[in-house]
């Protein structure tokens, strides 16, 4: 075991900086366009209850494990795994955690570009055009427009990364996260007070046992896994920036609260509004881009103050996209810094080039490159399938094996005690990391692949 302290490594200023940055990484597009849909589909309050229980057990364990490994080694994923031995599977575990953000952030930035386009159009007072049938399809088919929006989002993200951990990531997160919370509350209050919206509130929050099945558990498990930024290299990287006096367990709890609160607010923003618009038809709810870029503009167009609400909503979504994209980009940049020895600026430039190349494939994949498909998928869908459905569950499994088979619980406990003096949920952590988390991860892997291939519907 070769663990060396890197005293020259960048760091967050303290607990608040880490929590807001990690929460920003967790609060992303998935909270807004996937959580409400799944909650409505799988029993409302039952789904919420299962989600919270999983976040307090499965999510807690994985966040603590990755954060502790990062702080213990003071390295990004590749170096962190390699610190515990030279076996090939350790190297594989580190590299798969490192590659995932490199593949995700390009197509994530494409979607961020779409958000910029819609925000600008609402600011210009063109909400009526956004609500027209076919607008979104026409927009993403226009290679020039989507590419320009994508590049703007990339440059904004890279500019923040250039500024560093404290002056860039932490400073932006400290501004955007509180604003994001305020916006989500304002929009949720407005949404639930619309005529006919209370039916949607009941549908979202009141348990519906008729809709409960084991797929409810699987869906909640998958959403929690992807929502908390587990297995993306982010938490290992951010853990390596965490000061020794920061309490890992307390910080983890705060991140979980932030993430779950925003997800619930997203449900209260979207489900009641869609119900009010559709007359209570739950089939109107969709997941993914269709919900955000087709259904929501139609809903806003039929609401009073639709333009103002549209501006606030897409500003909220933009902040969520930015805080997640800077976390993904930072994880990639950190790997280049650690493994090749590049400066932050040089590493950021090279990651930016990768973002532009891979992101352009996704950006143009619905326009000039629409005829190009791999295993029946557009580029954006392909990258999403490879990372979310295949690589992330494997990366999480590698982390479970690293902690339970190589590092050991005692070392993790020693690291956690640096900041708080006690490992309060040690028993839960031990049972989860050794026995339950690996099984959950394998279930997520199997269900995600089956869903992507159309064998099941989630």
Where are these regions (language model features)?
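Membrane-interface "cap" regions at the ends of multi-pass membrane proteins
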Residues: 1-33, 62-67, 71-84, 88-92, ...
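Helix-loop-helix connectors at the membrane interface of multi-pass transporters/channels
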Residues: 2-5, 79, 112-141, 242-245, ...
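Membrane-embedded translocation segments of transport machinery
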Residues: 2-8, 12, 170, 174-322, ...
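Inter-helical loop and helix-membrane interface segments of multi-pass membrane transporters/permeases
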Residues: 6-9, 38-42, 77-96, 109-166, ...
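Select transmembrane alpha-helical segments in multipass membrane proteins
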Residues: 11-22, 46-50, 88-102, 148-153, ...
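Transmembrane helix-boundary motif of multi-pass solute transporters/channels
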Residues: 14-54, 236-239, 250-253, 257-260, ...
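A generic transmembrane alpha-helix motif of multi-pass inner-membrane proteins
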Residues: 380-402, 424-458
């Amino acid at each position: 075991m070769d663990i060396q302290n890197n005293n020259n490594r960048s760091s967050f200023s303290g607990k608040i900086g880490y929590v807001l940055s990690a929460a920003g990484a967790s609060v992303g597009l998935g909270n807004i366009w996937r959580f409400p849909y799944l909650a409505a589909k799988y029993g409302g309050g039952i789904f919420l209850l299962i989600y919270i229980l999983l976040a307090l057990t499965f999510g807690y364990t994985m966040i603590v494990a990755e954060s502790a490994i990062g702080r213990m080694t003071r390295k990004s994923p590749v170096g962190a795994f390699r610190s515990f031995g030279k076996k090939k599977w350790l190297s594989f575990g580190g590299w798969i955690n490192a590659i995932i953000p490199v593949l995700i952030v390009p197509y994530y930035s494409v979607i961020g570009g779409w958000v910029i386009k819609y925000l600008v159009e609402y600011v210009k007072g063109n909400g009526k055009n956004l609500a027209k049938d076919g607008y979104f399809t026409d927009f993403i088919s226009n290679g020039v427009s989507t590419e320009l929006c994508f590049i703007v989002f990339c440059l904004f993200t890279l500019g923040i990364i250039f500024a560093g951990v404290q002056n860039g990531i932490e400073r932006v997160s400290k501004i955007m996260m509180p604003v994001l919370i305020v916006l989500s509350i304002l929009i949720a209050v407005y949404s639930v007070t619309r005529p006919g919206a209370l039916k949607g509130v009941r549908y979202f929050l009141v348990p519906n046992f008729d809709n409960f099945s084991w797929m409810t558990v699987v869906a909640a498990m998958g959403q929690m896994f992807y929502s908390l930024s587990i297995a993306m290299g982010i938490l290992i990287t951010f853990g390596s920036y965490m000061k020794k006096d920061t309490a890992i367990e307390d910080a983890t709890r705060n991140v979980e609260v932030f993430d779950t609160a925003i997800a619930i607010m997203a449900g209260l923003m979207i489900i009641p509004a869609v119900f009010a618009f559709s007359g209570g038809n739950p089939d109107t709810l969709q997941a993914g881009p269709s919900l955000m870029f087709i259904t929501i503009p139609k809903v806003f167009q039929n609401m009073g103050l639709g333009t103002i609400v549209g501006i606030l909503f897409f500003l909220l979504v933009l902040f969520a996209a930015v805080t997640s994209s800077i976390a993904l980009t930072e994880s990639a940049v950190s790997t280049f810094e650690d493994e090749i020895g590049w400066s932050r600026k040089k590493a950021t430039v090279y990651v930016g080039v990768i973002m532009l190349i891979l992101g352009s494939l996704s950006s143009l994949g619905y326009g000039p490159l629409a005829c190009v498909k791999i295993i029946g998928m557009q580029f954006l869908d392909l990258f999403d399938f490879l990372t979310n459905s295949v690589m992330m569950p494997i990366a999480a499994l590698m982390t479970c094996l690293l902690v339970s088979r190589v590092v050991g619980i005692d070392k993790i406990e020693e690291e956690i005690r640096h900041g708080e003096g006690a490992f309060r949920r040690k028993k839960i952590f031990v049972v989860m990391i050794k026995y339950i988390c690996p099984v959950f991860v394998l279930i997520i892997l199997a269900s995600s692949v089956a869903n992507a291939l159309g064998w099941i519907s989630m």
